[in-house]
UniProtKB/Swiss-Prot annotation:
Belongs to the major facilitator superfamily. SotB (TC 2.A.1.2) family. This is Probable sugar efflux transporter. It is found in: Cell inner membrane. InterPro entries: MFS (IPR011701), MFS_dom (IPR020846), MFS_Efflux_Transporters (IPR050189), MFS_trans_sf (IPR036259), Sugar_effux_transptr_put (IPR023495). Its main location: membrane. The lineage of its organism: Bacteria, Pseudomonadati, Campylobacterota, Epsilonproteobacteria, Campylobacterales. One of its GO terms (cellular component) is plasma membrane. It holds the Pfam family MFS_1. Keywords: Cell inner membrane, Cell membrane, Membrane, Sugar transport, Transmembrane, Transmembrane helix, Transport. It comes from Helicobacter acinonychis (strain Sheeba). The keyword Cell membrane applies.
Length: 391
């Protein structure tokens, strides 16, 4: 019996690992254009700010597609659905590799975004289902760790491959790794019937929960602020701080490494006081942005700011995801779809705001605008906490 229990625990951990690796792949491909922005712009003879709108397009497709596509797929067995999503993901990356102009690249990114919109709508609840008994929070933490590793390994490696070969090779490598992940899913995951996915009728019920709605608005505000600055951090480091491309790569690595710390801190401290944890995470996101321009030429200060910023954004994302699941236990997939949509409204809006700031004011001002949105997010969080009695 002991061997059976140990075998079950090992298999469950392997399944959680597959989901964590999947999160790594999806987050890497969503954000790797940030690390390749200058190279993509150069290859198509465009400005970085204009190419940055591909981040906005991707995010807004996810925002618009998350809920309706989740509802359309609500009754589909989850393992089969995941394998279909990875098939679409891989084919779209092949199109990215052969893209002969910027519009074809955008079309390929649309396919990836559609897969992304369903994947993140169902993954949080699935990783909890396959987790070892009593390890649900840790499983969610490992899922967040996969996302963080995308920043630690995915973005820097994507940038290195882009510099050594070209940006197309980066997308090709991501597609190849995705194929391996799909094979692991096919091999390791059991049949996963749809459960507590929720239906269209769940929406009015969820929208009557003011704290939940407030959390969604908080996500939009906080993530918009973050991506106003982060979407253009690579050109900021090179053009404004005037650091070398190698330093920019290292800073992206540090940002992702900080995400591991954020995942650890979530597992250690979130349950003790969720309100204070979320507030501290917001502060860690907004302060480095507000101070970014002031210390633009002090390399060690920028490294420190980026490290704290990375801790903050990872801690914030996973804690808000957990809060949503806690507030909507009877419709987890619908609630997660709205969360994913809200998050990507923030990504798209942030990338758009950043582009507008660059064109109207200049690249150096992105941190001020991003930080100001972060301040609004902090005020909003304090308001909904007091108004609706967050526990």
């Amino acid at each position: 019996m002991m061997i059976t229990k140990q075998s079950y625990k090992k298999l469950a951990l392997m399944r959680v690992f597959v989901f964590s690796l999947s999160a790594f792949i999806f987050n890497t491909t969503e954000f790797v254009p940030i690390a390749l922005l200058s190279d993509i712009a150069k290859s198509f003879e465009m400005e970085s700010a204009s190419v940055g709108l591909m981040i906005t397009l991707y995010a807004w497709i996810v925002s618009l597609g998350s809920l309706p596509l989740m509802l359309l797929s609500a009754k589909i067995e989850r393992k089969r659905l995941l394998l279909f999503l990875f098939g679409l993901f891989i084919v779209s990356h092949i199109l990215s590799v052969v893209a002969w102009d910027f519009w074809v690249l955008l079309i390929s990114r649309m396919g990836i975004a559609l897969a992304h919109s369903v994947f993140w709508s169902i993954t949080a609840s699935l990783v909890i289902r396959v987790a070892p008994i009593g390890r649900k929070q840790q499983a969610l933490g490992l899922l967040a760790l996969g996302s963080s590793l995308a920043m630690i390994l995915g973005l820097p490696l994507g940038r290195i491959i882009g510099q050594m070969l070209d940006w197309r090779s980066t997308f090709g490598m991501i597609g190849g790794v995705a194929l391996l992940v799909a094979l692991l899913m096919y091999r390791l995951l059991p049949s996963l019937p749809s459960r507590n996915a929720g239906t269209l009728s769940s929406l009015p019920v969820l929208m009557k929960r003011p704290l939940l709605v407030g959390i969604y608005l908080l996500v939009i505000l906080a993530i918009s602020g973050h991506f106003t600055t982060y979407s253009y951090i690579e050109p900021f480091i090179i053009q404004i701080s005037q650091f070398s491309p190698e330093v920019a790569t290292l800073m992206l690595f540090v940002f992702g490494l900080a995400g591991v710390m954020g995942s650890f801190l979530f597992g250690r401290f979130y349950e003790k006081n969720p309100k204070k944890f979320i507030a501290c995470a917001i502060i860690l996101v907004l302060c480095p942005q507000l101070l970014l321009f002031s210390f633009k030429h002090l390399e060690w200060v920028i490294f420190l700011q980026i490290f704290l910023w990375g801790i903050g954004i990872t801690s914030l994302g996973i804690s808000l995801q957990m809060r949503v699941l806690q507030l909507a236990p009877n419709a987890t997939d619908v609630a997660s779809a709205i969360f994913s949509g809200s998050y990507n409204v923030g990504i798209g809006s942030g990338a758009l705001f950043g582009s507008i700031v660059i064109h109207q004011l200049g690249l150096g001002y992105i941190g001020f605008v991003g930080g100001a949105l972060g301040l609004l997010a902090l005020f909003w969080f304090n308001f909904i906490t007091i108004k609706f009695g967050a526990k």
